[in-house]
Every structure is written in C-alpha cells, then in structure tokens.
Amino acid sequence: MLFNDGWKGPIVDQHMHLDKTNRFLRAAEEFSNAGGTGIFLVHKPSFSTSLPRDINDYRGAYQETLNMASKVRKKIGLDVQVVLGPHPVTWDIQANTMGIEESTELHISAVGLALEMIEAGDAICLGEVGRPHYQVSEERWEKANEMLLEIMRMASSANSPIQLHVEDNGHQTCADMASLCDKAGLPRNRAVRHFASSDLSQRNTSGLPVTVSMGKGSIEGICSSIEQCNSHWGMETDFLDDPKRPGAVLGPRTIPKRTNQLCKALRLMEWDDEKIERYILDIHENWISSTYF
C-alpha cells in the first residue's frame, strides 16, 4: 500500500469533534480529500451555549452527535465511529453551579445513557470521560477520581472501551490510569489515553493504548520511542471545529499528512516496505479493531 513514498490505504483520525454550526461537513471533506478514510467522531459539549441540565438534555445532545455522524457517512463517504459520553470538564463546571452531588449524579446517569446507546450499536466507545486536565481543589480531585473509578467499573460491566480525557503529568498520568483500570476490573487494553504525547515507551504508557496528538515533532518522538513500544496506538487531531479557535487543536488534514511523513521516517530508519506497510495498517486498522471491537 506504499506508493511513491506515500500511503494508499486506511487513514483514521481517532479523536475528532465536529460542530453542525461551524465547518462540519467541510472539515470532514477536507480530511477525506487529503486521503483520510475514517474518523472517530467524539461527542462535544456545548461549552459556548448551554450544558445539559438533565438526562433528557443529554439524550438530545448525544442524538445530535449521531445525526452528524450519519450525515458525514452519507455526504462524504467516510467511515464514522461514534464516541459518546459526558466530558469531565462539564462535570467540574456544573459542580460549581448545581453542586457536586447533583453534578456527579447527572454525570453518572449520562455515562449510563451512553453505555445503553453503545449496547444498541449507535456508538462504539464511551468518551471522552476522565478527570479535569487542570488544577482543582484537593476535595474536587478526590471526587473526580472516585467518579472515574465508578465510570471504569460501569464500562467494564458493559464490556465497553473508553477514551480518557486526563491531565498531562508525564508518565505518572498513564500509571494512575492503569492503576484505576486494575481496581475497576477494566482491561488496560480497553482504556485509551486520548491526547497522548509521542513517547510510546512502556514507561510512559503503562501498557495503555494511546492516541497521539500528531502535532509538530510527533514523528520524531514516535520514531525515537517506537522500539520501546508494547502498546497499541493511533493518531488524532482533537480537531474542535470551534469558530472561536479556528484550526484548533490540529486541522483535519493533519493525520493523512503525518501518516505519509511516518512512512518516510521509517524508511530512513531502514525499515523495508513490507514492515512499514504492516505497521501503518496496524495503526489505522488492526489495532483499532482489537481495541474497540
């Protein structure tokens, strides 16, 4: 599937958001035109408008994400897998407005609803769930971890994979997540650390699958740690489709571009074409299947 130093095969962005009021189909088309074949469409809270106040609000918000996925499949022809769940920042914001107990109760209910929709085949993964990626009070942090442990237990009982939204604290972050997985009975290979660094070493991932934020320098980081990697991993942009932050976090064309750059970098490492093809196919197809299905 290598052709003139480029990759002609599956290319999947494993964490992308779309907004029906912003670029939406144009962003999906941009990804497709660059060579992309599939996306994981991750539910995005309406931080700029209004957050869900009850479970019916969540049901409507989740349905909007499912509707967008359907339109992208129909209009653009991409393979779209949906990730549904309540965002941990939503929980933190609402803990300040409705109280931590009510916010937690709503959050857990929203997890349950997402798992029901996953069980029904509407989505394939719970996410992005986790804990605040910024500093909060010690009390709030303890509550976030208690809630995340419960969410992991729910995912384990439902046999659902999860995508994790967590802080960047070096190797300690994945070590913490691995410990929580073990306590919850959730297999580590079903807990995907989203927005991960390009350090693929076992020390950094603690055996968790990760989706790497494929910004500048990511190819170099991947190549320098690839021999110490024993986890499945994928690529993501975390494209927000936010009119207030155009292009953030990374643009829709990034993953096709970085895939081709990785092919060239691996060739410079004296990998032969067959080995490169197997590896890229693992990233964009085989490891996705074993993690999510």
Which residue ranges define each predicted feature?
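Mid-domain alpha/beta scaffold segments of enzyme catalytic cores
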Residues: 1-158, 164, 175-184, 194-200, ...
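Gly/Ser/Thr-rich loops at beta-strand to alpha-helix junctions
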Residues: 168-171
